[in-house]
Amino acid sequence: MPGYDPNNIFAKILRGELPSYKVYEDDKAFAFLDIMPRAPGHTLILPKAPARNILDVNPDDLAHVMKVAQKIAQAAMKAFDAEGITVQQFNESAGGQVVFHLHVHVIPRHAGVALKAPASFKEAPDVLAAHAERLKAAL
């Protein structure tokens, strides 16, 4: 398995080198909206510590990321009147991972509404900003 690349896009977001639609932050985790959401409110939660994926993350950091994912899921249920939540996490290329910094997807769901294809649609900035505010208000 290759090592962690400190120049991956999520590492740059964590360092403030790239913008994001932040939803939540604490000393160990950061959550922000996916700019190519599969559904409104699609949020990514990642550890601040360098970790390529579940195979090399510190177990305490992984546990904390999942606690934050639960908070985001609860907020998303309220903020988007969701009927359910999809949680996804991919590891290595063969497992579907595209950005090699551990991250968990939390996606609000509604019955009968299919998810958009991955990376198929870039949401408008004003919509993302409004969705981030809805989630923050529900936390």
Outline where the language-model segments fall:
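HIT superfamily nucleotide-processing domains
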Residues: 1-139
